[in-house]
Amino acid sequence: MMKVLAVNVGVARPNPAKRADLTGIDKLPVDHAVQVRAPGPKHVGLHSGVVGDPIGDTKHHGGDDQAVYAYAREDYDWWEEELGRELPGGFFGENLTTTGIDVNGALIGEVWRIGDTLELQPTFGRIPCSTFQAKMGEPQWLKRFARENRTGAYLRVVTP
């Protein structure tokens, strides 16, 4: 059974990859409720589906099809073993750190229900970006991350 271990929200910081001036990839767990909404189109909408979560590169991130990003604790555990270092929830920039669900095997269009009313729908797996590469500092990280098919899932908001 799926469980949300943490809801993570970012803080706008200088982007180490310099693609955009700022990035919101640095996310930390919050201990309060957050509002989730459909943000609208990528280039003109509210960008993030999680209120208060900044997106620096709105050309490539955000919008309805990338409203929320989920990553599984089980995949973090696998990467910790591979990389030999600790990776806390939120480190990959996800809004939801989950357990008990194969996030990478999510079917596009299925509906995830969280809490009493929130419904999210997987849209596609993460395509890693240069900001993620810079944050990780691992050689060939983008290719390695994609090759291992442990990308997590982007989600659209069906019912806030």
Per-range role (PLM):
Residues L120-G152:
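Flexible glycine-rich active-site/ligand-binding loops centered on an Asp-His dyad
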Residues M1-Q133:
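Electropositive, beta-rich accessory/interaction domains or terminal extensions
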Residues A153-P160:
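Well-ordered alpha/beta subsegment
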